[in-house]
């Protein structure tokens, strides 16, 4: 593994952001204006409005000295079980295998009473990348307020191929990509673990944590890391603000950056100069003299999660109610990667990315 003494840059400030958010531009309940006001009032510095299959860029409207928008979208592919449906709606044939469906056509089908069972989905973010990524995409960069058709498959699909094509198509348009809420999406491990070129996987989704207890998972992430997939993780809200349960201000990233602007925030996300959390904090971590260490504001337990042989991981727990603020863990050399989880005294968690 790489010997990196400090994973977070010494220069810069910490900026809090939500990378997964929905407004009235898709199926959210808050207008973009209401969402920006709410997140600014709660100490956030940036938000990505990731509307379903709809790319928006509201930077001109909302960017200011202490808050910015990351343009993006949440692109979709679905597999439907059509068992029991006697006749498909006009224009759709099971022999096609799949259709590229616009939101307008989907609404028409619903009006016709077509309610298939959605058995699997891939939800993949495309977030506008760096200036270099946009330049490489040329005239393929997303236009403001652009709808993207979503793929609908009937009864079967090659899940890995579908996800890979979806991610690749977003990257071709100047975006970096994330794989969202795999447990909620009902996907199998083999459909995800060998995906390439995806920046991060969503390990904590506040909305589905509260909706159905299917929003927190690191098993998919570790499975990818164990196979040599150099992928990062992130936490988010995926807020829709429907009012039935809270889904804002619960999952976020903390990015270290010298400036609060699109280029710097995105560059620091891509380089791993951040941690993600649902309430706990981490101030620094790294590897020094073959020991991995972490500094935090006070933890009840700290997990060092390692790839490699059985028994390489370790947990350190606070004793006699005295919170942990700095812990180190000697490495054996057998580890293929290491990442850290900090659980604070209030039961909240912060996650680092992996050193590989």
What are these regions (language model features)?
Residues 2-176, 180, 187, 204-216, ...:
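A metal-dependent hydrolase metal-coordination microenvironment
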Residues 1-19, 33-36, 64-65, 81-92, ...:
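Charged catalytic cores and adjacent phosphate/nucleic-acid-binding surfaces used
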């Amino acid at each position: 593994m790489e010997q990196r003494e400090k994973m977070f840059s010494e220069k810069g400030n910490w900026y809090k952001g939500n990378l997964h958010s929905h407004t009235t531009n898709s199926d959210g309940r808050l207008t973009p204006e209401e969402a920006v006001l709410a997140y600014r009032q709660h100490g956030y510095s940036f938000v990505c409005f990731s509307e379903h299959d709809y790319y928006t860029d509201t930077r001109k409207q909302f960017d200011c000295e202490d808050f910015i928008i990351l343009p993006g979208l949440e692109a979709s592919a679905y597999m439907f079980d059509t068992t029991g449906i006697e006749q498909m709606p006009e224009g759709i044939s099971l022999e096609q295998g799949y259709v590229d469906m616009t939101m307008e056509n989907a609404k028409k089908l619903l009006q016709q009473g077509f309610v298939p069972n959605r058995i699997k989905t891939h939800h993949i973010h495309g977030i506008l990348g760096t200036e270099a990524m946009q330049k490489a995409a040329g005239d393929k960069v997303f236009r403001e307020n652009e709808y993207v058709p979503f793929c609908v498959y009937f009864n079967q699909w090659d899940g890995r191929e579908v996800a890979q094509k979806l991610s690749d198509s977003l990257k071709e348009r100047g975006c970096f990509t994330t794989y969202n809420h795999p447990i909620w999406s009902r996907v199998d491990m083999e459909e995800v673990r060998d995906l390439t070129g995806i920046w991060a996987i969503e390990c904590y989704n506040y909305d589905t944590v509260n909706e159905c207890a299917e929003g927190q998972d690191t098993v998919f992430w570790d499975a990818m890391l164990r196979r040599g997939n150099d992928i990062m993780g992130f936490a988010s809200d995926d807020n829709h603000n429907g009012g039935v349960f809270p889904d804002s201000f619960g999952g976020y990233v903390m990015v270290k950056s010298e400036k609060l602007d699109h280029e710097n925030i995105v560059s620091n996300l891509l380089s791993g100069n951040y941690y993600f959390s649902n309430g706990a904090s981490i101030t620094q971590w790294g590897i020094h003299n073959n020991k991995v260490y972490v500094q935090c504001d006070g933890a009840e337990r700290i997990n060092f999660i390692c790839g490699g042989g059985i028994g390489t991981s370790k947990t350190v727990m606070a004793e006699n109610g005295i919170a942990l603020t700095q812990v180190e863990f000697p490495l054996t050399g057998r580890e293929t990667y290491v990442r850290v989880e900090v659980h604070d005294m209030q039961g909240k968690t912060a996650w680092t990315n992996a050193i590989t």
